[in-house]
C-alpha cells in the first residue's frame, strides 16, 4: 500500500481542522498563564511581643496532576508610627504536599496538620511546634474514615487547654454480610476463616448527594493530642449529621460542651451542597475527658439549643463566653428557596454550664425584604471566621454579598447595628481572611484586577463610629507579563437596568432595577465597532455573580470579549422581595430580565447586536438554553455547562427534586416523591426543551458524567434533540467530573473550547 502521503498528513483529534488546531495552540498558551494565577484562600495571624506573624494558605492549579497544589506563604507584619503597615515576606512559599487541613491552636504555639488518605490507609494527625514535629498519630479506618474538610460539615476545634481537638470525620464502615464458598451466611463472630469467603454489599445508605458520593455519615470525635487516644462522641442519634463543631467556654470549673450544627436526614437526605434550605439546628453535648468508656450515653444527653427556629449553623462563642452566636437560613428552610436572605442570632450562654430546658434566641440581624437604595440589603454569608471578634468582645466581622459586590461588615452584637468595614465607595469584592487585633487582613479583587492582600486599621470616623483605613500590601505573588498586559486595558462598571414588568401584584423590592456587571476593554470601539459580547449567567438561581476576579473569565476578556454579567431577580444580595419574586416564574421572569439587560447594553451602544454570545452553567445553563429557544435570533453562539434542560426528566434522578417543584410552583406544598402527570407537564412547559423547535444557535455543551445535581442524561437529551433538528452542536464530556466542572484539566479544556467556539462565530 502506498503510504507516501501519510508522512505529511497530521493526526488531528476529533472536531479539529488545521486552522482550528492552530488557534487551539495559540489560545492554550495564554489560557495557561491565567490558569496559573493562585488563589488566596485563608490566613492566620499569630501575635508576639515583636509584632504579628501572618500565614497565608494559597492554591494553584496543577494541570499535569489534575489537582490543586497547596502552599503556605508567611510574613512579618510591622506597624509603623506613621500609620503605615509593612509585610516582610519569607523568601519562598512552602508546598504542603498531602495536607488536608491546617488548624493552629488558640495560643498559636501548636499547629495541627491533618492528612486524609486516598485509600483505606489511616488518617494522619500531626502536632507541630514552632520548630519541629512533636507528635504524629495514625488513626485507622476501624476508628473513623477521612476527616471532613469540605467547608460545610467541616469542623476542627482545639479546646482552650490545647489538650484535645474535636473534629468531624466519616464514621467507620458498617459491617457487611459475609458468605462462605458455598454461599452460606457467616455470623460476624464466626471463628471460621476458611478460604473462598466473600463480602456482600449490605443495606444501602443514603448520602448527601452532589460532592458527597461515597462519603460516610459525618460523626463527632475528640482526640487527646498528648496520648493520641480518639473518642467517638456517644449520644448523638444517627439521624443527625454533625458538623461545624466548637468548644464551649471553660470557666469556673463548669462543664464543657461540644457545640455543633446538625442536619436531620431521617426521612431523606436531599443534596446539601449549595442548599441552605436543609433544616438544621445548633446542638450541645457535654464532654468530660475522664469519662468512663462504658458510661451510658443517656447520662450526657444531647441538647437542641435552637428548637424554636428551623435553621442554625456556624456557631461561634464571644471572646468572654457570654454569648453563642449563629447564622440562620430559616427563610430558605421555611420558603423552600435553596438559598435566601439569612439572619444572625445570639443565645446567652450560662456561666455555670447548666443548660436550660429552652433557650431565648435574640435576633441580631433580621431578614431584609425591601432594602432602600444604597442601604444594607440583608445577610448572605457562606460562613464565619473561626475568630471573628474585635477586642471590644461584641463586634463581629463577616463577609457578605451586597448587591453585585462582596463586602466586609462589622456587626454590633448588642445593638444589631451593621456598618461597612470595606470601603463604601469600592465596587471591588472584599473578603475578610483574619483579624490582627482590631485590624483586618483581607483580599480584594475585581473582574479586571487580580486578588490583592489588604490591611485595614480600625479608627473612628467624624461621627465617632468605627471605620477602617485600608493599605495595599505589596504581595510577593508575581503574575506573568502576558496576564498583566491582557488586564491592563480592561475596565468594568455596574449597570442598573430598570425592569419592565412592574405589575401591581409584585412586591416592592422586586420592582427595583436589576444589575449587570459590564466588563470591556478601554480600546473597544476604536474602529467604530463594539467588541463581541458574552452574556454571563450564574446558576442557582438563588446565587450571585459578584465583582470578583475569575481567571477564566478574565482570559476571555483579554482575548477581545466584553462581558455582561447579569444578576437577574432571584439573585442574592438584593433583599428577600426580589429573591422570592422568581420561584414559580423560572424560564419566564429570569429570561426576560436577561433579555432586558442585553437590550439595555445594545441601546447604550456598548454591544454589537450581531456578535452576542451567551454562557451559563446549571441554572445559568437553563437560562442559556431558554434564551436560544425564546430569542433564537439574538445570539450567534452559546455555551452551556451542565445545564438544566428538562425538569420533567430531571426530577426523578437529581439529588434535589424539591428544587424542581419549588422553582416551578413557587412553594413547597406541591412536593411529592411521585410527581403526577400534571406536575411533569408543568416541568416540561417551564423547561428549555419546550422551546427546542425554535433553536438555531450553534451551542457548545460541557457535561460531567458524575454530576448528581443535573445528571448528564438531561443534557444529552437536549443535545440529541438539537442534532435531530440539524442545529450545530459540540459536546465535551468529562468522565470524572461532577456538577461544578472545576477540576483543573476540565476547567482548562472547557474554557479553551469556549474561546475557540465563540471565536468561530464572532469571527475574532
Swiss-Prot record:
Single Gene Ontology MF annotation: serine-type aminopeptidase activity
Catalytic activity annotation: Cleavage of an N-acetyl or N-formyl amino acid from the N-terminus of a polypeptide
EC number: 3.4.19.1
GO cellular component, one term: chloroplast
Result of altering residue 618 to A: Loss of catalytic activity
Assembly and binders: Homotetramer.
Function description: Catalyzes the hydrolysis of the N-terminal peptide bond of an N-acetylated peptide to generate an N-acetylated amino acid and a peptide with a free N-terminus. Can degrade the glycated RuBisCO (ribulose-1,5-bisphosphate carboxylase/oxygenase) protein but not the native protein. May be involved in the elimination of glycated proteins. Plays a homeostatic role in sustaining the cytoplasmic antioxidative system. May contribute to the elimination of the oxidized proteins in the cytoplasm.
Protein name (record): Acylamino-acid-releasing enzyme
Amino acid at each position: 500500500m502506498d503510504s507516501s502521503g501519510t508522512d505529511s498528513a497530521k493526526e488531528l483529534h476529533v472536531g479539529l481542522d488545521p486552522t482550528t488546531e492552530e488557534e487551539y495552540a495559540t489560545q492554550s498558551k495564554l489560557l495557561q498563564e491565567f490558569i496559573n494565577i493562585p488563589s488566596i484562600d485563608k490566613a492566620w495571624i499569630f501575635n508576639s511581643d515583636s509584632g504579628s506573624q501572618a500565614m497565608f494558605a494559597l492554591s494553584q492549579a496543577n494541570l499535569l496532576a489534575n489537582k490543586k497544589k497547596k502552599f503556605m506563604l508567611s510574613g512579618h507584619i510591622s506597624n509603623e508610627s506613621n500609620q503605615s503597615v509593612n509585610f516582610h515576606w519569607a523568601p519562598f512559599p512552602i508546598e504542603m504536599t498531602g495536607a488536608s487541613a491546617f488548624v493552629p491552636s488558640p495560643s498559636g504555639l501548636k499547629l495541627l496538620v491533618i492528612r486524609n488518605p486516598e485509600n483505606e490507609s489511616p488518617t494522619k494527625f500531626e502536632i507541630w511546634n514552632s520548630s519541629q514535629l512533636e507528635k504524629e498519630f495514625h488513626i485507622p479506618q476501624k476508628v473513623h474514615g477521612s476527616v471532613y474538610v469540605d467547608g460545610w460539615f467541616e469542623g476542627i476545634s482545639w479546646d482552650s487547654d490545647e489538650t484535645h481537638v474535636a473534629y468531624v470525620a466519616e464514621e467507620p464502615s458498617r459491617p457487611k454480610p459475609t458468605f462462605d464458598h458455598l454461599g452460606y451466611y457467616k455470623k460476624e463472630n464466626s471463628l471460621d476463616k476458611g478460604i473462598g469467603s466473600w463480602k456482600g454489599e449490605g443495606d444501602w445508605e443514603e448520602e448527601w448527594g452532589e460532592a458527597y458520593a461515597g462519603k460516610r455519615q459525618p460523626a463527632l470525635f475528640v482526640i487527646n493530642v498528648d496520648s493520641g487516644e480518639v473518642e467517638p462522641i456517644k449520644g448523638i442519634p444517627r439521624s443527625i449529621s454533625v458538623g461545624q463543631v466548637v468548644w464551649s467556654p471553660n470557666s469556673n470549673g463548669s462543664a464543657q460542651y461540644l457545640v455543633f450544627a446538625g442536619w436531620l436526614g431521617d426521612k431523606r437526605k436531599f443534596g446539601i451542597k449549595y442548599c441552605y434550605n436543609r433544616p438544621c439546628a445548633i446542638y450541645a453535648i457535654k464532654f468530660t475527658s475522664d469519662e468512663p468508656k462504658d458510661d451510658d450515653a443517656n447520662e450526657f444527653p444531647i441538647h437542641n439549643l435552637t428548637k424554636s427556629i428551623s435553621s442554625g449553623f456556624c456557631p461561634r462563642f464571644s471572646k468572654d463566653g457570654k454569648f453563642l452566636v449563629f447564622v440562620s437560613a430559616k427563610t430558605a428552610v421555611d420558603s423552600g428557596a435553596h438559598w435566601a436572605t439569612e439572619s444572625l442570632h445570639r443565645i446567652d450562654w450560662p456561666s455555670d454550664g447548666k443548660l436550660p430546658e429552652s433557650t431565648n434566641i435574640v435576633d441580631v440581624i433580621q431578614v431584609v425584604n425591601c432594602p432602600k437604595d444604597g442601604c444594607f440589603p440583608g445577610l448572605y454569608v457562606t460562613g464565619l471566621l473561626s475568630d471573628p471578634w474585635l477586642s471590644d468582645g461584641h463586634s463581629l466581622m463577616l463577609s457578605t454579598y451586597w448587591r453585585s459586590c462582596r463586602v466586609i461588615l462589622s456587626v454590633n452584637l448588642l445593638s444589631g447595628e451593621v456598618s461597612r468595614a470595606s470601603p463604601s465607595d469600592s465596587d471591588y469584592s472584599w473578603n475578610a481572611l483574619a483579624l490582627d487585633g482590631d485590624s483586618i487582613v483581607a483580599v480584594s479583587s475585581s473582574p479586571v484586577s487580580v486578588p490583592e492582600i489588604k490591611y485595614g486599621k480600625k479608627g473612628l470616623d467624624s461621627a465617632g463610629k468605627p471605620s477602617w483605613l485600608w493599605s495595599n500590601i505589596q504581595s510577593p505573588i508575581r503574575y506573568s507579563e502576558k496576564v498583566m498586559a491582557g488586564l491592563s486595558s480592561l475596565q468594568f462598571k455596574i449597570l442598573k437596568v430598570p425592569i419592565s414588568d412592574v405589575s401591581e401584584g409584585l412586591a416592592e423590592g422586586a420592582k427595583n432595577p436589576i444589575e449587570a456587571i459590564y466588563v470591556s476593554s478601554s480600546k473597544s470601539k476604536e474602529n467604530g465597532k463594539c467588541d463581541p459580547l458574552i452574556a454571563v449567567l450564574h446558576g442557582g438561581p438563588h446565587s450571585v455573580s459578584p465583582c470578583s476576579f475569575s481567571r477564566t473569565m478574565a482570559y476571555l476578556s483579554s482575548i477581545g470579549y466584553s462581558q455582561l454579567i447579569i444578576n437577574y431577580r432571584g439573585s442574592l444580595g438584593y433583599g428577600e422581595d426580589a429573591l422570592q419574586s422568581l420561584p414559580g416564574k423560572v424560564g419566564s421572569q429570569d429570561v426576560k430580565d436577561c433579555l432586558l439587560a442585553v437590550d439595555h447594553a445594545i441601546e447604550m451602544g456598548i454591544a454589537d447586536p450581531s456578535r452576542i454570545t451567551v454562557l451559563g452553567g446549571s441554572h445559568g445553563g437553563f437560562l442559556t438554553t431558554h434564551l436560544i429557544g425564546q430569542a433564537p435570533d439574538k445570539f450567534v453562539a452559546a455555551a452551556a455547562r451542565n445545564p438544566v434542560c428538562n425538569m420533567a426528566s430531571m426530577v426523578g434522578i437529581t439529588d434535589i427534586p424539591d428544587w424542581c417543584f419549588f422553582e416551578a410552583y413557587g412553594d413547597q406544598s406541591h412536593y411529592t416523591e411521585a410527581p403526577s402527570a400534571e406536575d411533569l407537564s408543568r416541568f416540561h412547559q417551564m423547561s428549555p426543551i419546550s422551546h427546542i423547535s425554535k433553536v438555531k444557535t450553534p451551542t457548545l455543551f460541557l457535561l460531567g458524567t458524575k454530576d448528581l445535581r443535573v445528571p448528564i442524561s438531561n443534557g444529552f437529551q437536549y443535545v440529541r434533540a438539537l442534532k435531530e433538528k440539524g442545529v450545530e452542536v459540540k459536546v465535551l464530556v468529562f468522565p470524572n467530573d461532577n456538577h461544578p466542572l472545576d477540576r483543573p484539566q476540565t476547567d482548562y479544556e472547557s474554557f479553551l473550547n469556549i474561546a475557540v467556539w465563540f471565536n468561530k462565530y464572532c469571527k475574532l
